[in-house]
A protein has these predicted regions:
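Rhodanese-like catalytic fold shared by cysteine-dependent sulfurtransferases
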Residues: 1-18, 24-60, 65-104
Length: 104
């Protein structure tokens, strides 16, 4: 399975995915917005929540810019057999592509 998903592709599939915000707590706290329907999960506590995710649903996650945080979380989730990908460019790439954000 690919590790990334383009913002353009996600726009057509948004409703079909479980959306996870995995920005570090300080980055999330500094922001006023998130993707619609996103649930925040602390990437530092991945071991506490990863096993509770559905194995039969596509999972899309994002951090600030789609870098090391998203990449490491996707790697860990895929290693557990989950269908996880991250948004290329993170929430910043999503917004730059005209993706909708909402107040958190």
């Amino acid at each position: 399975m690919d590790r990334t998903l383009s913002p353009a592709t996600l726009k057509t599939e948004l409703a079909d995915n479980l959306i996870l915000d995995v920005r570090r707590a300080t980055d999330r706290d500094a922001s006023t917005e998130q993707l619609p329907g996103a649930n925040w999960k602390d990437p530092e506590k991945l071991a506490d929540w990863a096993d509770g995710l559905p194995k039969d649903q596509d999972i899309v996650l994002y951090c600030v810019r789609g870098g090391s945080v998203s990449n490491s979380v996707v790697g860990a989730l895929q290693a557990k057999g989950l269908k996880a990908r991250f948004i290329e460019g993170g929430i910043e790439g999503w917004k730059a592509a005209g993706g909708e954000v909402v107040a958190k």
